Amino acid sequence: MSHYFKRSLLLALPIAFAFSSYSQTSIENVPKGWHLKDFTKDGYNGISLDKAYEFVKGKKSQTVIVAVIDSGIDTTHEDLKSVLWINKKESPGNGVDDDKNGYVDDIHGWNFIGGKDGRNVKEDSYEVARVYHKYKAKFKNIDPSTLSSEDKEIFKMWKRAEKEIVGNGQESGMQVLILRRTYDGAVKSDSILRVALAKETYSGTELEAFMPVTEEAKKAKSTFIYFFKANNSMEMTNKSFLDEFNQYLSGEEKKTQAAEKAPLNYRSDIVKDNYNDFNDRYYGNNDVMANTPFHGTHVSGIIGAVRKNGKGIDGIADNVRIMTIRAVPDGDEHDKDIALAIRYAVDNGAKIINMSFGKSFSPEKAWIDEAVKYADTKGVLLVHAAGNGAANLDSSENFPTAKFVGSKMKAPNWITVGASGDVKAGGIVASFSNFGKNEVDVFAPGVKIYSSIPGGNTYGNAQGTLSLIHI
């Protein structure tokens, strides 16, 4: 689930049932593909893609491999399967590491959050909870003056985690109560609508066209339309919405228990590496689709969906290959997986690495820093999303960052991107986007972006961390 979905859903919940109808806002007035348009010619604050192609007309292009470190990609999608990176040194399906890179049958990339037995990590805990409980016994009630210099730095991180965890108490409990009641109401409304529509699955668009007869069905329609539109996801189905809602609710319930209950180690049970040994790096599997490839599929379509084929959408780049690296679960990613994902991308020819994820703590950031430095020696650019917390990154964190641990130096091969919009799409700067005069380099379209989604030939809107793709 996208982090924007979570944020907008939470903001919508307290008033979701207070209105019997949804007031259409200007965000619905932008066309599909507005992010590619030109302000002077088309009236939208897009990236002026046609002008860019006109500028390079007649010039010879070179194929660029873009690594997408994300939740996975639907490798069967009609608009993506022909632009996927193929490891030509590997023979598919023979169970042999033909290219001797340590990863067996890595045809389109690698899944760092999978097990050799074929199982995959779908959900995971939040880093703040992992940090808090890892050091709780060591630092609780300790006199910090007795600590070594190294431990003092870890103590500072733990105190920040403690403040966030303990401070989540009563307020978070009330939010979860609202979430639970609203989810139960959504399930009830869905059961009413499925009977009224005489179908088990329906999209927001189908629901909007439906004219209910009974007052009960009218109220149920109003509720679901509100949620669909609040997330700019009219193409989403009722089943997908309730599944994502349930996942989010589960995560929020875990947060309220975080102070007393240590998070489950989902990754360890499946991946089975020695996490603390960075040299134990040849783990995972080649299932790059795995469980929930929504975000990665959407991102990849924006980058390189086949252009001018009359299907779905046109991607930005017309001579690109997408390398799929799955390292981001529903929850917070682990630093080791991200560091190894970056190294895998570099070693296998990627020239750009797309990273549409983030978290507020990064205890093993030094591993990522070394991977970023390695990428720099190979001329590889890393593009990272600023994040969707509406926070000032000059005074808060969204890891990974360009700043190296224990240094004032920044990675020269790193760009941090915030999400922009359009006046017709709610404003030039997306309301949810992080920002920062010093820490955010540029803004790019990130509101109501239409692209490929899992399902083979399916498309829909999403928004948030995917803004960096336009850079």
Q: Locations of the language-model features?
A:
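Sec-dependent signal peptide cleavage junction
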Residues: Y22-Y44
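Short acidic, glycine-rich surface-loop motifs adjacent to enzyme active sites
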Residues: S26-K32, D143-R180, I342-E364, A385
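Hydrolase catalytic cores
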Residues: S300-I303, M323-D330, R343, D347, ...
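Glycine-rich, charge-decorated loop segments at or immediately adjacent to ligand/cofactor-binding or catalytic sites
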Residues: N388-K408
